[in-house]
Amino acid sequence: MANSSGSSRNLTAADWGGFDDNMQSGGGAAVIDMENMDDTSGSSFEDMGEIHQHMKEEEEEVEGEGVPEDGEEDGAFLGMKGVQGQLGRQVADEMWQAGKRQASKAFNLYANIDILRPYFDVEPIQVRHRLLESMIPVKMISFPQKIAGELYGPLMLVFTMVAILLHGMKSSGTIIREGTLMGTAIGTCFGYWLGVSSFIYFLAYLCNAQITMLQTLSLLGYGLFGHCIVLFITYNIHFHSLFYIFWLCIGGLSTLRMVAVLLSRTVGHTQRLIVCGTMAALHMLFLLYLHFAYHKVVEGILDTLDGQNVPLPIQRVARDLPVGPNTVLNATVQVLLAHSR
């Protein structure tokens, strides 16, 4: 009994001893942890940690912001001239590129031959038909007649008239000096074609005629076909009666053709009379000028140029000899005659 009670005590003591050991070890760990802790509550400790962390972050931000501000101030101070120089170069480069684009656009506009292609894109057979039609007056004037909108035929007729005028001046024995004859012929033909076309277009605009400048140039240019025929024949066959016949027949037919076309495109009797009368008068008088007055005008121009280039003739004026030498000469002659006797 005593043994059993003693063993139970020992077992109990052993069991409690293990428990005590565990408690002591756990208690020792608890004491160490508590010693490392501050005498503050958990919430106040966390608040202090957060405040400390916020202060450190603000200091780092201030330091981080302070360095770039100093760098920016230094860059602004040291690189101001560099920035201005780059800006100036960029502006100059933009101006140069803009000017280059404008110049290239203008060059392409005026140098591109495709712009003039529609005005000269015509077949030779079409030109031949239009030349024949320019000698046939139209009968229907109740509706606008069609006008060819091309310049190839009129331009060739103007150059043909220049060649005919040169042929007529050379066949008459006119001496060419310094290209005056060529320049006069080109100026006369092109001046009439462009000048009269512009004047007729101006009158047509005032009289409300339905015609454009291109159509006026084409109409008047093809109207020169009759003039070329008359001048070519009369420069080789010099008969004034023959010229007047061709002037009325051939020149009159080409003029009637132009008048009929203008009549079909003009509304009102007064407007028709002004436009068509002016066109007919200028066209017929120009043919008379080329046959009768053109040669005289050119010869007058050549004579004027010759008079400016020829030097003045040398004039010989008799000079009076002094009286003294004549007296001595006469006395010498008389003495020689007396000795010879």
Swiss-Prot record:
<feature type="transmembrane region" description="Helical">
    <location>
        <begin position="273"/>
        <end position="293"/>
    </location>
</feature>
<keyword id="KW-0963">Cytoplasm</keyword>
<keyword id="KW-1003">Cell membrane</keyword>
<comment type="similarity">
    <text>Belongs to the YIP1 family.</text>
</comment>
<feature type="topological domain" description="Lumenal">
    <location>
        <begin position="294"/>
        <end position="341"/>
    </location>
</feature>
<keyword id="KW-0472">Membrane</keyword>
<keyword id="KW-0221">Differentiation</keyword>
<feature type="transmembrane region" description="Helical">
    <location>
        <begin position="186"/>
        <end position="206"/>
    </location>
</feature>
<feature type="glycosylation site" description="N-linked (GlcNAc...) asparagine">
    <location>
        <position position="330"/>
    </location>
</feature>
<keyword id="KW-0333">Golgi apparatus</keyword>
<keyword id="KW-0325">Glycoprotein</keyword>
<feature type="topological domain" description="Cytoplasmic">
    <location>
        <begin position="1"/>
        <end position="146"/>
    </location>
</feature>
<feature type="topological domain" description="Lumenal">
    <location>
        <begin position="234"/>
        <end position="242"/>
    </location>
</feature>
<feature type="topological domain" description="Lumenal">
    <location>
        <begin position="168"/>
        <end position="185"/>
    </location>
</feature>
<dbReference type="GO" id="GO:0005794">
    <property type="term" value="C:Golgi apparatus"/>
</dbReference>
<keyword id="KW-1133">Transmembrane helix</keyword>
<feature type="transmembrane region" description="Helical">
    <location>
        <begin position="243"/>
        <end position="263"/>
    </location>
</feature>
<feature type="topological domain" description="Cytoplasmic">
    <location>
        <begin position="264"/>
        <end position="272"/>
    </location>
</feature>
<protein>
    <recommendedName>
        <fullName>Protein YIPF3</fullName>
    </recommendedName>
</protein>
<dbReference type="InterPro" id="IPR051521">
    <property type="entry name" value="tRNA_Mod/Golgi_Maint"/>
</dbReference>
<comment type="function">
    <text>Involved in the maintenance of the Golgi structure. May play a role in hematopoiesis.</text>
</comment>
<feature type="transmembrane region" description="Helical">
    <location>
        <begin position="147"/>
        <end position="167"/>
    </location>
</feature>
<feature type="region of interest" description="Disordered">
    <location>
        <begin position="26"/>
        <end position="46"/>
    </location>
</feature>
<dbReference type="GO" id="GO:0005886">
    <property type="term" value="C:plasma membrane"/>
</dbReference>
<dbReference type="GO" id="GO:0030154">
    <property type="term" value="P:cell differentiation"/>
</dbReference>
<feature type="transmembrane region" description="Helical">
    <location>
        <begin position="213"/>
        <end position="233"/>
    </location>
</feature>
<keyword id="KW-0812">Transmembrane</keyword>
<feature type="topological domain" description="Cytoplasmic">
    <location>
        <begin position="207"/>
        <end position="212"/>
    </location>
</feature>
